[in-house]
Amino acid sequence: MELLGQKVKEDGVVIDERILKVDGFLNHQIDAKLMDEVGRTFYEQFKDKGITKILTIEASGIAPAIMAALHFDVPCLFAKKAKPSTLTDGYYETSIHSFTKNKTSTVIVSKEFLSEEDTVLIIDDFLANGDASLGLYDIAQQANAKTAGIGIVVEKSFQNGHQRLEEAGLTVSSLCKVASLEGNKVTLVGEE
């Protein structure tokens, strides 16, 4: 997605050789038109897979996931990082390590909203080591739901997340692939 790549290069802030900040359009302030294009692109890539639900994790995955859900005309379900007092029935849970925050969280999804009848598309904002996507895949497996694929907005291709997801047998679609953050500069795959 050329528009997304341009936005990452122009508005992304390199924190260090492993961390890219995209708060201006994805992780804090959201560019709704760009997220609409992200959702439309995921729809075009997975429209023939029988998607019944979009699955993501709070908070930064919600914007691209909700836009994808609009294009698929299906519900968007997000894993919660804390169990609310209103969740009185059963739930699926797994542990996910955040590369950016260097923190492990237990995330949950109510059994009421995910079942073996679902075919999910997992959407996430970033792919680094793949822990968030693998955690969501684990939740889908606990529900005996089918996972049609993983949609990633920004992939850091210099890390091993893509490989880990493919080794798990998952189809991965990354809309923007960052090859390097060296020299305080964003270099996309194909530009190196």
UniProtKB/Swiss-Prot annotation:
UniProt name for this protein: Xanthine phosphoribosyltransferase
PANTHER family linked: HYPOXANTHINE/GUANINE PHOSPHORIBOSYLTRANSFERASE, XANTHINE PHOSPHORIBOSYLTRANSFERASE
Name of the coding gene: xpt
Pathway named in the protein's UniProt entry: Purine metabolism; XMP biosynthesis via salvage pathway; XMP from xanthine: step 1/1
InterPro entries tied to this protein: PRibTrfase_dom, PRTase-like, Pur/Pyrimidine_PRTase, Xanthine_PRibTrfase
CDD domains in UniProt: PRTases_typeI
Keyword Nucleus annotated: no
Top EC class of this enzyme: transferase
UniProt keyword list: Cytoplasm, Glycosyltransferase, Purine salvage, Transferase
Reaction equation(s) it catalyzes: XMP + diphosphate = xanthine + 5-phospho-alpha-D-ribose 1-diphosphate
